[in-house]
Amino acid sequence: MTHTNEHDHKAEQQQNGRGDTTTETVNPQKMKLVTKLLIDNKFGLMDDLNFSIPLTASSEGVPISAKTSELGTEYLKNQQENSVSPILPISRSTRIKADRVRIYLDYYYNILERCISIDSSQNHHEGVEGVYNPLQVIRNRKLKKKHHELPTREFYTTKHPIIAIKQFSKKPNKKMPWFVDINEKYMDLTWRTSHWEELVDPQGKLWFQSYSPSNESSGSSSSRRHHGHHIHPRRHLQHHSRVRTANSVHSNTQSLTPKRVMTNEEDNNNHNNNNMITKIATTPEAQISRNKKSDLNLSHIHLEVPITNTVTNTSSDQGSLIIEAKGSSYGGDRRGSSNTSGSGGKRNSKHYRSKSAGPPENEKSRMNGLEKIISKTSKGWSRSPKKNTPGLEKQVLLNPTISNGGTSRRSSNNGESISTNSSKSSMGITFGNTETYKTPVDNGKDAIIRQSLLSEVPVHTLRGKTSNRSLRAEGEQALESDKELPNGAGSIYEGAPREKTTSQGSEPVGLVSDSLQVDEQLQRYWHDTRYIMSTVAMMQHRRETHDIVKRREIARRNEIEITQDADTNIRKTADALTQYDNELNKVLKLGNDWTSKLLNDYSIRVETLISSSDRILSDINTTLTLKLKMFQENTERYVTVKVMRAQKMTKTIYRLLEFGIVLVLWTIWFLFSVLRSIRFTIFLVLKIIKALLW
């Protein structure tokens, strides 16, 4: 007994567990909702097909069908309460019209909502913005008519719905109707943004006397204002273009204007009898005038030396450079040197003059005329970057100074000797004691042909204390190497001349050649070597300064200013990170739970729901197909009944015709039989009379 009871108890627990699982997996409310949706779809389909179930009314007013009459009225009442209310039969055209009106009203209320729902911060026009006022639209309509601003043409792809105020008014086509349409409302919103100063209030006064801050660029009322509104932007554009042009001219002026030449105090003290060296500031007009000269006259290169050298580069057909150095020397000694070249045997002379002496008169007058012409068109040249580029390339001021080392042979200046490089990085301005530097290739002409071997190396000026120091060190090394040469041979460093020609009076003196012989090939090799060494030193110094600046910038960026307690910040950060990790673990756990539920529980529920919905849909499809077949059978039966009724009618007619014919024949037979009987009776009476008479 106990064993059987335990077995029954286990079976009940299993059944309860199954029931719990079924209740957990299936939600009756969702099933009801799905069933209602399917039934609604069914009735909608039946309504579209104009198919209805024939029902018979009971005594209590409850419709009873033939199949469900056996269940009773109570069941039918409950079913009627829980069932969906029947849909009224509405035609398709009525639904289309109702949908059109609904879309119209939704659009209208959407526009009204956009007009009214404006934040107070954006509402700059109180009384007009953020207010639904169709009377204001009608007043704006009058203003449009006053200024002949006709409304835009309206296009309708479909018929607009019937508006009652237009449809049932006495005059539907008024010029000024008291009705605001959607299109008019929308156009009024656009129109009033440029006519705020013309809007009129109900008293006939202007709403806004002047422009509001948000509408400075809006239009105005009259045609004059409209015209000005279209013209002012061009004036502003012209003004801005002039400002930009001025800025570009100013920037070009700054770019074209080189730095001033730095003079030497020792040079001023030592050269008391000579003219003072003035500071040169090249203007853009003079720069452009020098750039616009003929191809034979290139720009001058100003050298920062106590004896200022003006180098004039004259390009020949073969591309050679004829170099003249002009300046003033110190003291009354006048010494010139000249030497003949190896092949040509001609003399290359160098003339020195002071910079304060200025150019010749004819050249000065030509420069003034060109400057007057160029000053008129300087704006057009300043705007073009291509026209300003050659000027920047042709004139470069170099200011690295090199210490002299105390030798009197260098120059009269005891302080520094300046090295010069051209903007093209080497134009070959190297001078010997007796002649200008020439390349190993010589064609025997008077001009010195300089190949582009050294011009391939780019050399840029380094301005600064560090560059000056490095160049001074290079200069000292050059002086030490110069001391080893004979007294007659002059030392050259990067093309800096060191000859003395004229005195204060600039009197011409015959050139005196040195008594000592100089190896020209060795001197050229030495010049090339010193030039390349100086170039490499300058480039190395530039790389070192660039590395120093880069390291400083990286160190400045990597500096972190800690203004608070670092330990407290670290502790707070650690606490925040731990809290974040805990919250993240909670969220991950919750997400894992949900994923497991979705994969395990809800997947089963979804499968059961899908299977039940498929079953219900299949039942609905079968019922619909059966009903459709019944409908088809009924229609066919109706056709056959009509045919059968037609056959019965003809049969009755034929029978009536037959009966009539038989009746006529029987009447004829009856008549003949009556006549025959009458005849027989007459003959019988005659015979009886005859017999009696006899």
Swiss-Prot record:
- Which regions are flagged for Basic and acidic residues bias? 1-12, 471-485
GO CC annotation: cytoplasm; lipid droplet; membrane; peroxisome
Q: Which residues form a coiled coil?
A: none
- What transmembrane ranges does the database entry give? 655-675
Q: Where is the composition biased (Low complexity)?
A: 211-222, 403-417
Q: Which residues carry this modification: Phosphotyrosine?
A: Y493
Task: Cite the entry's keywords alphabetically.
Answer: Cytoplasm, Membrane, Phosphoprotein, Transmembrane, Transmembrane helix
Q: Where is this region: Disordered?
A: 1-26, 211-287, 325-437, 465-511
**Segments of skewed composition (Polar residues):** 13-26, 244-257, 276-287, 418-437
Share any extra remarks: Present with 396 molecules/cell in log phase SD medium.
Protein's name in the database: Maintenance of telomere capping protein 4
Identify the coding gene: MTC4
